[in-house]
Amino acid sequence: MNANNLLQAAIFIVVLIAAAVPVARYLTRVMDGSSAVVRVFGPLERALYRLAGIDPLTEMSWKQYALATVAFNALGVLFLYALLRVQGWLPGNPQGFGPMTVDGALNTAVSFVTNTNWQDYTPEQTVSYLAQMLGLTVQNFLSAATGIVVVLALIRGFARHTAQTIGNFWVDVTRVTLYVLVPMAAIIAALLMSQGVIQNTKAYQDVPTLQTTSYAAPRLDAQGNPVKDAKGNPVTVQTSVKAQTLAMGPVASQEAIKMLGTNGGGFFNGNSSHPYENPTPFSNFLEIFAILIIPAALCLVFGNTIGDRRQGVAVLAAMTVALAAAIGIETSAEQGGTPVLASLNVDQAASPLQAGGNMEGKETRFGIAQTGLFVVATTAASCGAVDAMHDSLTPVGGLVPMLLMQLGEVIFGGVGSGLYGMLVFALLAVFVAGLMIGRTPEYVGKKIESYEMKMVSIVVLLTPLLVLVGTSIAVLADAGRAGIANPGPHGFSEILYAFSSAANNNGSAFGGLSVNTPFYNWMTAIAMWFGRFGTIVPVLAIAGSLAAKKRIAATSGTLPTHGPLFVVLLLGTVLLVGALTYMPALALGPGVEHLMLFVGAH
C-alpha cells in the first residue's frame, strides 16, 4: 500500500460521501412527492397509472406489497425467458444469433430479474441487440427499482406508527424508475460516451490485423466448454488469425444502468475491463462511483424519513469504515505481490516504470489502486461487474471480495438490498445488546419482539444455507466437479465463490470454473431466486410489523443507536455472523491457497 493507492482511495470516499448528501435529499423529496420534478412530470406519471389501471392513492399491506413484488418479477422472468428463446426470429439481430438453450435462457432470465446478472455465456456471441435493449437493459432498471422500493417500504415501517400499510408497490416502482434511475442513467451514459464508450446498432466490424497470429486454442463443445482428453487435459487446435472482428452495440446506455443499478452484467465478455465498456481511468472512477452512490444516499434517506438524521449517518459510517478497511486489505494484498515471485528475485516493487505487485489479470490503464477500488466496490455492493479477472487475484485478494459477498453485501450493498440487509443486522445487534443488559430491544423508537427476530433469522440464515449447501452438492456431484479447471483449493474456491455470488445476487465469478452446463444453470438459478425473494418477503414482513407498532419514547435505559459505540456493535455483529458461518469453508479455499504460496516459495 503506497501513497498513490491511499490518495486514490481517500479521494474516492470523500467524493462519494459528499455526493450522497444532495442525492439523498433528492430521493427523499421524490418519494414523498414534494420534489419539483414530480410536479412537472406528474401528468406523465398519472397517465401511466391510468393506462395500467392503478389507483395511486390506495396503499398496500405488507402481504399485498410482497405479492405484487414477487408477481411483478416472476412475470419479468417469463418475458425475458421467452425473448431469449425466440431472439433468432426477431429483428435487431444483425449477427444472426440463435435462441439460447432452455437452461441457459432460464438462468439468464432469473439472473437479470434478481439483480444478479450472473453470465455464463459470452454476450457478444450469444445475445442480440434487441434482447440486450428490450430484455436485459429493461430488467436492469426494474430489478434495481425493486430493491430500492423494498428498502423504502422498510423505512416507512420504522417511520410510521399504528399503520396497516407500507406504501403502494406500483407507485414506488414508477417513481424510482421515472425520476431516479432514468435521469441518473442518462447523465452517466453521456459521460461514458464522452470517454469513448460506444453506442450504436451497427453490425460487427471485421478489420485486418497488422500480422498473422498463430496459437493453440482449446477445442470447445456445443455448450462452449473446453473439451478434455482421457487424462483430463484440454484438447487444443492450432489456429491462425489474419483478421479481427470488433463487436459493436448500444453499450453506453446499458453500461450506465448496469453500474447505477448495481446490476453488473457486461455487454461484452470482458465486462468493464473491455475498452468499449470502460476505456479510461476517469470512466473507471465514474463506474465505481455509480455503483455506490445510490446505496450511500439511501442511508441518509433512512435518517431523513424517520426524522433522525443521526441514525442514517451512523449506518453510513459503519459501511464506510468497513469499505475503507476492505480497500486497504485488498490493495495491500495485490500490491504486495506473491512470495513465489519474490523467491525468484523478481522485482515486484512499484516504481515510475511499473505498477509492481500482482498485475496478472489487471488492466494497465487502471493499475492496482483503481482495480482494488473496483474489486471491493463491486462485491461490497451486489454489482458483480469487473474491471479485472478475480480468478487472478492473490489468495487474500480473492478472499476479500468473497467475504464481502458472504457477509450479505451489507457494506453499502446493492441499491436497496444493501441497506435493508444492514438494517436487519441492526435489529440483530440491538437484540443481542438487549439480551446482555436484560432489556427489551428497541431501534429508532420501535420495540423489537419475537416476530421481528424470527424474520431476521430467516434473512440471516437463508443465504448461507444456499451458499454452503450449493457448494457441497457441486463438490460431491460429478457434474459439479467436471467444471473445475484448477483442481485443489483454488478449484474449491471457484465453486464457493460461484454460489456466494449467486445466492447473494452479485454475479461476479472466478473465471476458471465452467458453469455453462445444465447442472450449474439450474443450481445457480435456484440460489439466485431464493437468495433474492427469500429475503425480500421477510424484510417486508418486518416492515409491516414495525409500521403497526406504536412509537415509544427513548429513556435513560435505551441503547443509543446513533453513536460510535453502536457503529462498533453493528460492525461486530456483521463480522461475527460472517466469520462463524463461512470461516471453515474459507479456510479450505483461500486459506490453504495462501499457505501454499509460501510452500512454493521454498
UniProtKB/Swiss-Prot annotation:
Signal peptide boundaries: none
Pfam families registered for this protein in UniProt: KdpA
Localization in the cell: Cell inner membrane
Transmembrane segments: 3-23, 64-84, 135-155, 178-198, 282-302, 313-333, 418-438, 456-476, 522-542, 565-585
A GO cellular-component term linked to this record: plasma membrane
Membrane topology recorded in Swiss-Prot or TrEMBL: Multi-pass membrane protein
Alphabetically ordered keywords of this record: Cell inner membrane, Cell membrane, Ion transport, Membrane, Potassium, Potassium transport, Transmembrane, Transmembrane helix, Transport
An MF annotation (GO) of this entry: P-type potassium transmembrane transporter activity
Top-level taxon in the UniProt lineage: Bacteria
Subunit details: The system is composed of three essential subunits: KdpA, KdpB and KdpC.
PANTHER family cross-referenced by the UniProt entry: POTASSIUM-TRANSPORTING ATPASE A CHAIN, POTASSIUM-TRANSPORTING ATPASE POTASSIUM-BINDING SUBUNIT
Matches recorded under HAMAP family: KdpA
NCBIfam families: kdpA (TIGR00680)
Similarity-based family: Belongs to the KdpA family.
Function per UniProt: Part of the high-affinity ATP-driven potassium transport (or Kdp) system, which catalyzes the hydrolysis of ATP coupled with the electrogenic transport of potassium into the cytoplasm. This subunit binds the periplasmic potassium ions and delivers the ions to the membrane domain of KdpB through an intramembrane tunnel.
Protein name: Potassium-transporting ATPase potassium-binding subunit
Organism: Burkholderia mallei (strain ATCC 23344)
